[in-house]
Amino acid sequence: MHFQKCDYLFDNQVKLRLQHNAIRFRLKRSEVEEFARTGRVEEKIISGSSVNQMFGYALESTEKVSSLKATVRPGAIIVQVPPETVMRWASTDQIGIEGEQAVDNQTSLRILIEKDFACIDGTDEQNADTFPNPLIEERKLSEISC
């Protein structure tokens, strides 16, 4: 897997990226723990005082699904994940959970949930509560051996 430099500066929030018919969530350590413990993590963006000016997104652990399932509706995205998948991911060094959801005969929605790694060039504050980045460790080892 390829690790990239961080292109965002948000702290302590489930990170969401929407691109090319794909949904990607990144969770910090405490969020992975919360997801495993409570079965849900969520965030919202509020741009005004009315309900129409709010956008929410959530990950939900439920036995109602056997694979990743996304529901997109006005003002919200909810991705459901089987509980055993969540527990295996949260309790191991598995980096992510990935799936595809058929939309029609020619289109699918890619869903990816990842552990958030420390940014290579990030500050201590930006890297708080993240998972160790293997590239940082490799860099440290190569500096020692030179």
PLM features per residue range, with description:
Residues M1-D11, N52-T62, I113:
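Short, flexible domain-boundary/linker segments around small modular repeats
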Residues C6-N12, A36, I46-S47, T107-L109, ...:
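Accessory DNA-engaging acidic/polar modules
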Residues L16-L18, I23-L27, I77-V81:
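Short, structured motif recognition centered on aromatic/hydrophobic residues
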Residues K28-S30, R37, P82-E84, S91, ...:
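Surface loops and adjacent helix of pleckstrin homology
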Residues K28-S50, W89-N105:
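Extended intrinsically disordered, low-complexity coil regions enriched in Ser, Thr, Gly, Ala
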Residues G39-V41, G48-K69, R73-G75:
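Conserved loop->alpha-helix
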Residues S66-V103:
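Mid-chain, well-packed structural core segment of small domains
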Residues G96-C146:
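C-terminal charged interaction modules
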